[in-house]
Amino acid sequence: MKKWTIEDSKELYNINGWGTSYFGINDKGDVYVTPCKNNTQIDLREVMDELALRDVTPPVLLRFPDILDNRIEKTWSCFKRAAEEYDYKAENYVVYPIKVNQMQPVVEEIISHGRKFNLGLEAGSKPELHAVIAMQCQSDSIIICNGYKDQSYIELALLAQKMGKQIFIVVEKMNELEIIAHEAKKMNIRPNIGIRIKLASSGSGKWEESGGDASKFGLTSAELLEALDFLDKKGLRDCLRLIHFHIGSQITKIRRIQTALREASQFYIQLHKMGYNVDFVDCGGGLGVDYDGTRSPSSESSVNYSIQEYVNDCIYTFVEAANKNDLPHPNIITESGRSLAAHHSVLVIDVLETASLPEMPEEFEPDENSHQLVKDLYEIWDNLSPRNVLEDWHDAEQIREEALDLFSHGIVDLKTRAEVEAMYWSVCHEIHALAKSLKHIPEELMKIDKLLADKYFCNFSLFQSLSDSWAIDQVFPIMPIQRLDERPTRNATIQDITCDSDGKIANFTTNRHNTHSLPVHALKKNEPYYLGVFLVGAYQEILGDMHNLFGDTNAVHISEKDGSYHIDQIIDGETVEEVLEYVQYNPKKLVRQLEVWVAKSVKQGKISLDEGKEFLSNYRSGLYGYTYLE
């Protein structure tokens, strides 16, 4: 057998496909991160070793702010190239919707590095608006106000505009326009009004229904005319400065984007012809991330275009439409939060233990005392060949079903059932190996791979850290971060530590294909085995829930410095005490209740005084400990 190489691991996990120059494998067989243009490699295994010395245990979220900076620069550079190519005469604005990742250190880094690119922020709720107004210090940076709005939301936005903020209030529903008009008159201010238009075009992928006629937000053509009439009556015609559209997140096909842009450009033209001098077009989100590295439009976890192609289409479509109609080029806004944030975070989890299906030892041979069903399965196993593999599979299935039925009726004993199951799984392993040599694998045999996978139990909560994996079956790149110079000899599904059967991952991307198991290595005694889950910087942190009361994980900020790495900040994960308080427990009261119970148990002689002290000490220290296993 050919010696396994690092190149084999690169191909197996397709790291060159989804890694987009940020991730790779070094000569030691460890995954590295290249956050900066200077190509400094940060070894993830070395990072985890240092964190272990500093008593920071998995699960841990590694954030690389330098990657955020690079994504901002890359997007801005793409706009600059497109503007030069198409002789674009207006301004483009990159806006970060903070709903993608509202964590303060993330937003702060985006604002800090985005300042020189005039990067703006988008708020989709009242709490988000409070954060955005306070953090966005540059008066010329754009703030987009989306989402449902009440009087206090609109009043806050208008007052901020009055004090110099460049705020656009985007109308989602007609009643919002009425509130804007009322509050603006009261404050004696000319509001910057935007209108979200409900396009007929829709996106593609998991969020396809976010756009089109069934979309949740936006005004139809008839409602738009009603809004224009209202603006005229209120003397606010000149205040309509922006149109906004959004056809869905993670759009997989560039053709859907092109269609939507053409439709939106006609709204821009028609409004100008009607005398509304709209000077901003907000193209919304949708710029996707290639999570599986395939660049395939048929995969819901991929995209078939680049950032440059997306930006080119945005600029070209409106330049062409404006030029044909002798209109000024609109200022173009994009809200590409997923593309900005996804790559900068890596979740590292450790494998606690494994479980695999039972198999008969190779030296096993049935004897005269063995049940006939065991003998029949052994005969199938002993005579397996590629020519009869499907028939043998059917026979093995029938024998197992018969054994389970006989056990349920009390006809065969537990020992026989165990032997039948072990022999059955031995047959399955052999059939799976033989099937790989077939030119055309029967569909029935394809499911064996899923059945035979080991279970790798990992120290994390799927619901807290990878919500989209559970909720919408989103595929994230997952791979070991070490031992990649060794051949992976096992295939496994990933199980979390929640008490929920949904807490598992059984959908992976390898070799440019989606599979139901992940190639992994057998565990070594007294050696940690880490798995990295990549591209988790968008939505996953903020969508996480506290199923089984597992809280936020440890988070570590790592930057490149002088050709190496520097740990800038360690943010401790939530403690047991903190998550109990979320669900309205009073930890101090819990301790007091236990003290009474323990004292009573000591008096009754159930435990000694020292045992009581030890129990209370363990309980108190547990309250201040990590919610995950340590």
Residue ranges of each PLM-predicted region?
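Active-site-proximal beta-alpha core segment in soluble small-molecule metabolic enzymes
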Residues: 87-282, 287-289, 293, 304-309, ...
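Short, glycine-/Ser/Thr-/acidic-enriched flexible segments
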Residues: 30, 38, 67, 101-103, ...
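Conserved, well-structured core domains of diverse proteins
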Residues: 1-57, 559, 566, 576-579, ...
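Low-complexity, highly charged intrinsically disordered N-terminal segments
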Residues: 25-102
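Short alpha-helical segments and helix-capping/turn motifs at coil-helix boundaries
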Residues: 7-9, 73-81, 104-109, 129-130, ...
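Flexible, glycine/charged-enriched surface loops at secondary-structure junctions
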Residues: 58, 62, 84-89, 274-278, ...
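A non-catalytic, amphipathic alpha-helix used as a structural packing/dimerization or gating element
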Residues: 66-74, 226, 263, 313
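Charged (often Lys/Glu-rich) extended helix/loop segments that serve as interaction or gating elements
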Residues: 305, 313, 319-630
